[in-house]
Amino acid sequence: MADTGLLEALLQRVEQLDGGVDSQDVSAALGVDHQLVVGAVKSLQALGEVISAEQKSSKHWELTGEGREIAEQGSHEARVFNAIPAEGLPQNQLMKMASGKVGFSKAMSNKWIRLDKAHEGGPRVFRTVESIEDTVRDKLQLVQNGQSAKLEEKEKNELKKRKLLAEVTVKSYWITKGNSFSTTITKQETELTPEMIASGNWKEKKFKPYNFEAMGVAPDCGHLHPLMKVRTQFRQIFLEMGFTEMPTNNFIESSFWNFDSLFQPQQHPARDQHDTFFISDPALAHEFPRDYLERVKKVHSEGGYGSQGYKYDWKIEEAQKNLLRTHTTAVSARMLYKLAQQEKFTPVKYFSIDRVFRNETLDATHLAEFHQIEGVVADYGLTLGNLMGVLHQFFTKLGITKLRFKPAYNPYTEPSMEVFSYHEGLKKWVEVGNSGVFRPEMLLPMGLPEGVSVIAWGLSLERPTMIKYGINNIRELVGHKVNLQMVYDSPICRLDS
């Protein structure tokens, strides 16, 4: 509430001027800032019908800072004219004055001065008239004295164009007496206490009306992490494109499904401890589809299905090793094997979004644990052209239009492509995904019919999130150093579809 003294002074002013009073006049009469008077009006309105206040707007002209300076010291052109002696003044010396550039231009337009470019000592400025009348200063002084009505609109607009005048809208209140008007402030109670009820003095108290429309205190609640917001958008995009979500509840996977089923040789560097987290307990898996396992073993060690294989001694002990899955393609392999067991093949489109784990060196764009997004399409006759078309459609829905494709090598896809997107924050191209056409050596041992092709792509969830939220360091998005305030403040992510 405003100061009680100001409230009572305002009420006394309304009492004296029975017909009403303007808040601007009250401000001037009491010698206080108008905003304080407005605050007093609001406080009195909160007390009930003590006063009635109607807001009104009025416009008036007032001088800018430069305008006030000119009203006191004269216009720039007048100052330039007065600075030129009878013998003239070198132009370069004139331009060094504070008002030199603007004043020279205006004085030339007014034909008060002339420039002699052929003068012996260099360009020199001379007066062309004996005396001048500083009309700009005179007009500004009229406005300063509250006589702006004496100026024509054209003159005001010219001064406004020179940024010497400004048209200001002032909001004020017309204040009159209310039905419960009194010059005495009666404190309103905000709470009904047990003591008031026990003593009965609540009957003499005046209570402040309860505002049922007031906003309550916002309840504390959970906030979605930016990753989860973007994950929701990705999931919606896949569903819009007609994909079915794959179950991804197995963080621990066997080397067979994670590597061998994908036609990745057991000597591949990615299977080394430097890139994979192996599980110590349970260390080995024992349940596999035996007929499928034998076909995988054969295509690795001897070849088949039109392939020479890798020609090495494939070991079941290596395939049994449990690990934290390094990609969700292991899930895709399980789903494609399940699809191959159906009596009749039907085209499918699968997707998944879940965590994967890699024993990588941490830096601004790499984590040991991150989310992989995977899309898989299986149908007859799919080619690299189909893959590129789906990728363009998919990434356009993400709002990522700056894309580059680069040929790559994957043991289980041929041809293969890496997908890069330009990161505005890092000012460089960042790899956001990998893609390719699954090899026959992977698909045919599963039991899928010849002629069926499977195109697939995968990307991380973290890097597109960094791009959309303008985050340069992945450790600011995920990990123990994340600022929780960022989670509270991060806006909803809308991918431009």
UniProtKB/Swiss-Prot annotation:
InterPro entries cross-referenced by the UniProt entry: aa-tRNA-synth_II, aa-tRNA-synth_II/BPL/LPL, Phe-tRNA-synth_IIc_asu, Phenylalanyl-tRNA_Synthase, PheRS_DBD1, PheRS_DBD2, PheRS_DBD3, WH_DNA-bd_sf
UniProt protein name: Phenylalanine--tRNA ligase alpha subunit
One Pfam family hit: tRNA-synt_2d
Protein family: Belongs to the class-II aminoacyl-tRNA synthetase family. Phe-tRNA synthetase alpha subunit type 2 subfamily.
Catalytic activity: tRNA(Phe) + L-phenylalanine + ATP = L-phenylalanyl-tRNA(Phe) + AMP + diphosphate + H(+)
Keyword field: Aminoacyl-tRNA synthetase, ATP-binding, Cytoplasm, Ligase, Magnesium, Metal-binding, Nucleotide-binding, Protein biosynthesis
Record text on subunit structure and interactions: Heterotetramer; dimer of two heterodimers formed by alpha and beta subunits.
Its EC number(s): 6.1.1.20
Biological process according to GO: phenylalanyl-tRNA aminoacylation; protein heterotetramerization
Cofactor: Mg(2+)
Binding site for L-phenylalanine: 329, 372-374, 412, 438
